[in-house]
Amino acid sequence: MLSRLGALLQEAVGAREPSIDLLQAFVEHWKGITHYYIESTDESTPAKKTDIPWRLKQMLDILVYEEQQQAAAGEAGPCLEYLLQHKILETLCTLGKAEYPPGMRQQVFQFFSKVLAQVQHPLLHYLSVHRPVQKLLRLGGTASGSVTEKEEVQFTTVLCSKIQQDPELLAYILEGKKIVGRKKACGEPTALPKDTTSHGDKDCSHDGAPARPQLDGESCGAQALNSHMPAETEELDGGTTESNLITSLLGLCQSKKSRVALKAQENLLLLVSMASPAAATYLVQSSACCPAIVRHLCQLYRSMPVFLDPADIATLEGISWRLPSAPSDEASFPGKEALAAFLGWFDYCDHLITEAHTVVADALAKAVAENFFVETLQPQLLHVSEQSILTSTALLTAMLRQLRSPALLREAVAFLLGTDRQPEAPGDNPHTLYAHLIGHCDHLSDEISITTLRLFEELLQKPHEGIIHSLVLRNLEGRPYVAWGSPEPESYEDTLDLEEDPYFTDSFLDSGFQTPAKPRLAPATSYDGKTAVTEIVNSFLCLVPEEAKTSAFLEETGYDTYVHDAYGLFQECSSRVASWGWPLTPTPLDPHEPERPFFEGHFLRVLFDRMSRILDQPYSLNLQVTSVLSRLALFPHPHIHEYLLDPYISLAPGCRSLFSVLVRVIGDLMQRIQRVPQFPGKLLLVRKQLTGQAPGEQLDHQTLLQGVVVLEEFCKELAAIAFVKFPPHDPRQNVSPAPEGQV
C-alpha cells in the first residue's frame, strides 16, 4: 500500500515539474556569455566576479547530463552538436587570448580541461576541437611563468591521458593544423576521421543541424564579438610559432613552481612511454620532442659557472628529477642551484629513455650523444684550460653515477671509448677523446689525474661489457703475456724466488733488510693446475717486508676486514657480469698461432706507470690509483685473474704484470728506506696521522712514508680479492658465503 502511494506521489511531482529543454538552456547560457562582451563596458572587472564562470559550469553540466541520458552510447546529443558546429571552443580560445575580462584565460583552460575529461564522447578527432586545443596550447606556451600555469598543466594532463588511451590522437593534437592545410592544398575534404555528416564542422552554414532557437545578435563563430574585442584577439594561426603539446610541456617543466614542473615532467613521461609503435615513430620523426629535450639540457649546462669544484659537485650527486632542488643542509657555493637544475634534468632525460618506447628511447639517446656529449661536453673535455677539464670531467663522473638507461649508457660508452674492439698497439691513434682521457690520468695536475681516474672507476661499475673489453680484455685475448713453452708452475717451489727476480738489484740484497719469508706451505695446487689460493694470497701478504709494515700495531687494519669488503664487491661485480657469457678458464695457448708482441693497452699502461711511482706521488692520488686497480681485479674473467692476480705466471719477454710492478716498487723501497733515519717510528706516526690518531704535523719524507702505507694496504686488498676469487667462480653462479678469519 505504501509503495503504491509513493509511486502516485512521484507521478504527481513529475507531472507538475516542467520538462527541461537542454538545448534551449545550453544556448541561453552561451548567449549570456556573448552578450556580456556586447553589452559590458567595464574592462577591469575580473572574470571570476562576472557570471561567466557560472555559465560555463552550467554548460559543462548540461553536456555531461545530456550524455548520461543518451539512449545509444557513442551518439552526440544536440548540445554537443551545437558546441561542435558553432565552434564555441574556438571562440572561447580567442576570448582567452584577449584575457578580457581579466582572468578569462584561466576560465577557458578550466573549461577545456573539464569538457575533455568529463565528456566521454571522443572529441579530439574533430577539427573544431583539436584546432582550438592547439591554439590554446600555443597560447599557454607564450605565457612563460604566467598565473595560469596550474590550469595549463591540468589541461596537458587531460590531453596526455587521452593520447595514452588512443595514441592516434597524437598526430591530431601535435600537427592537426598542418594536416588540414595539406588536405586543403590537395583538394581533400577537411573532415577528419570519426566526423559524421550530422555534426561535421562547417563554416557558417547550419544545414543538417537540428532545429534550434535563434540567438539574438548571433553570427557565425567569433564574428559577433570582433567589433567588441581588443585588437590583440587576431587569429593565432597568423603567428609563426611552432608551439604545441611538446613545447608546452617543456615550458611547464621549467616552471619555478615545483609541483607544476613535476606534473609536467610526469605528463611528458606519459607521452613518450606509449606502447604504440606508430605513435612512437610519429613522435620521433614528426615532432621536435627529442631535440627540444636535449636543447634544454644543453642550456642548463651552459648556464652553470665555468669552474666548479669537484668536491662541490660530489655533494649534489644523486639528485633525482623528482626532487631536483639542492639539499638545504648542504653548504652553499656559487652555481649550486644551476648545478642542481642540470643534474636533475639529466636524471630526467635518463629516466625518459628508460621508460620510453624503444623507438623514442633510441632517438633520444642519440640526440643526447650528438647534441650534448659531442657538441657541448667534448670541447670542454678537450680544452687546454685545466679548469675546464676539471669541471667537465667531474660533471661527467656525476652524470655516469646517475645513468641507468641501457640506451644512453651505450651511447656514453661509444662517446668515451670509441667502438674499436681490436687489440691496441703502442703507436696507434686511439679514439680522440679516449686518448685525451688516458693522458689526463697522467696529467701534470694531480687534481686532474685524480678526477679522471674517478671517472674511469665509475665507468667500470656500469653494466656494459664493452667498457672492460675496450679498457683491458681486448689486449689480453689469446694470452700473449704468457711466455711460450713455459709450463704452468705446479707448486710454490717451482716458482722464481724473490732473491732471483731480475727486478731486484744487488743493493737490495745487501741492504741488511730481510726479504719476505717464504710461506711454509704444502705444494698443493688446485684442481685445474693453478697455484693454490693460499700461496697466491700469501705472496701478496708477504710482498711488503716486515720492516715496512705498521698495520699490526693498530686495530681494525687487518686482512680480515679486506676479505669481508672484497667478498661484497666481488658478489656485486659477479652479478653485474653474469649475462656476459665469460669463460671459466683461460683460453689454451695455440702453438700454431704466430706469436704477437704483448701490449697491456693504454689504460693499464698508465695505471702501471702510476703504480710504479707510488712512493713519489701524493697520498690522495695513490688511493685513487689503487682503487681503480682493485676494481679491475674484481672482474671474474680468467684472463684478468691470471694477469692481475697470479704472481706465478711466466711472463713473456718484456712484459710486466701488476705483481711484477709491485716487486719493482718493493725493490726501490728497500733502497730508499736506508736513507731515512728512524724509518719504523716515522712510518708508524704517519699511519696514525692518516687514521686521525695523531696530529698532522709535517715530517721529512712524508710522501714516501704515506706511499709505503698505501702499498701495504693495497697488497692486503689484492690478497683479499684473490682469496674470494680463486679458484675462479662461475659468474653465473652464486658465490659461496663470505669467509671468516685469516688465511
Curated annotation (Swiss-Prot):
Expressed in liver. It comes from the Eukaryota. Residues 186-219 are annotated as: Disordered. Residues 196-206 have a biased composition (Basic and acidic residues). Able to activate MAPK/ERK and TGFB signaling pathways. May regulate the activity of genes involved in intestinal barrier function and immunoprotective inflammation. May play a role in cell proliferation. Belongs to the FHIP family. This is FHF complex subunit HOOK-interacting protein 2B. It comes from Homo sapiens. The gene is FHIP2B.
